[in-house]
Amino acid sequence: MINRQLSRLLLCSILGSTTLISGCALVRKDSAPHQQLKPEQIKLADDIHLASSGWPQAQWWKQLNDPQLDALIQRTLSGSHTLAEAKLREEKAQSQADLLDAGSQLQVAALGMLNRQRVSANGFLSPYSMDAPALGMDGPYYTEATVGLFAGLDLDLWGVHRSAVAAAIGAHNAALAETAAVELSLATGVAQLYYSMQASYQMLDLLEQTHDVIDYAVKAHQSKVAHGLEAQVPFHGARAQILAVDKQIVAVKGQITETRESLRALIGAGASDMPEIRPVALPQVQTGIPATLSYELLARRPDLQAMRWYVQASLDQVDSARALFYPSFDIKAFFGLDSIHLHTLFKKTSRQFNFIPGLKLPLFDGGRLNANLEGTRAASNMMIERYNQSVLNAVRDVAVNGTRLQTLNDEREMQAERVEATRFTQRAAEAAYQRGLTSRLQATEARLPVLAEEMSLLMLDSRRVIQSIQLMKSLGGGYQAGPVVEKK
């Protein structure tokens, strides 16, 4: 008898082991993950030579020593609806990770149930349809009551849930990096609009100076015409000039209004609480880039960090999809009381205990698991390719913005020389007027070329400031990848 029981136990063990080993669906096709760009590929072309400088610092705008700009950016970062939306995406990603993690933990629930039923005289429980109190049967109506604790645990031996949780945590880390990218975009957007407005204020001042010079010329020519000393052609020429300047003044004032309204929307100001922006001089800008990019660029660009985490999350999703091919094990248990008579429910004899280990073997699924794995792998490879292109685009941004800024610096040096040359001519005209060699009109009009060249210099300075902010943004704006969020 004992030998027979041992034989049966051995047979069951052999069959169970064989089923465990072979009891999984066949992975028909799974391509390898695409390669990510290597750090040595993250560099500028050899023929691009730019000035060397350090990486931008956090809160880079404070180095510009402009209280107005600082207040605008602080207000934007504290009240932006776009940033609030990004932070809500963080919370959503965190809740999704918590939800998946909770599903892999021990689940315990209290259970209470009443079941009023009529037992069929022709069913499996037909004997209980009789009314025989002596036998403990008072059918056909019964009220079954059940109370107790129900527990379940998925053992997750192959990491289906574990990989899914890791993917959700990766998505949460990506959301954190995306929030930093939104903050960077908002700060740089405010700074660019702010300095565009400052440049417009300075342009308006130069145009008004030009208007005053030409207005003097108009009055001088008008006086000469009135005294018969000059034909009307110079007068009408000066009138055309002043009208052209007036047109430019109107355009610049309109541009100031447009920029202010764009800034109002970006900082989240209402119709009556937009802070007054006073004119200030444009700042000196940093024109260099770090000596090397490589890993540093990946760690300092929040958008690249977000993409990297999405890639990692996609690889974890592939691991989860592969684990679905293997057997899954779970354990369910119940401990409580069950009785078909309410008055006996809480008696010792009503105790019930169930222990239910379970095994699920994916043998034939019509290709569902393979289709899921193939789609998940394709999505992961797409994310890797998108990441690779994003890295190349980031290097391109640094190269293009750095080159543009260096070109603007060279142009500014030449334009500064032109301004100085016209100023020399103006000073010569004023000296000639002081010696009585030329008229006051000629000395005054000598100011016009200087103003024109100063406008050109202002436009270059404005573009340099905007371009330097764009370069700073392409270098990450002081962002550094911090500690990652891990499973609690």
Swiss-Prot record:
Pfam families cross-referenced by the UniProt entry: OEP
Organism's domain of life?
Bacteria
Main location per the UniProt record: membrane
Q: Which Gene3D superfamilies match?
A: Outer membrane efflux proteins (OEP)
GO biological process terms held by the UniProt record: response to antibiotic; transmembrane transport
Q: Where in the cell does this protein reside?
A: Cell outer membrane
Residues in the signal sequence = 1-23
How does the protein associate with the membrane?
Answer: Lipid-anchor
Give the positions of lipid attachment, kind S-diacylglycerol cysteine. Answer: C24
Q: For this UniProt entry, what's an example GO CC term?
A: transporter complex
Q: Which InterPro entries match?
A: OMF (IPR050737), OMP_efflux (IPR003423), RND_efflux_OM_lipoprot_NodT (IPR010131)
Question: What keyword terms does UniProt attach to this protein?
Answer: Antibiotic resistance, Cell outer membrane, Lipoprotein, Membrane, Palmitate, Signal, Transmembrane, Transmembrane beta strand
Lipidation residue positions, type N-palmitoyl cysteine: C24
Molecular function (Gene Ontology), one example: transmembrane transporter activity
Q: Belongs to which family?
A: Belongs to the outer membrane factor (OMF) (TC 1.B.17) family.
The UniProt subunit note reads as follows: Could be part of a tripartite efflux system composed of MdtN, MdtO and MdtP.
Report the protein's function: Could be involved in resistance to puromycin, acriflavine and tetraphenylarsonium chloride.
UniProt-listed PANTHER family: MULTIDRUG RESISTANCE OUTER MEMBRANE PROTEIN MDTP-RELATED, OUTER MEMBRANE CATION EFFLUX PROTEIN
Name the chain's protein. Multidrug resistance outer membrane protein MdtP
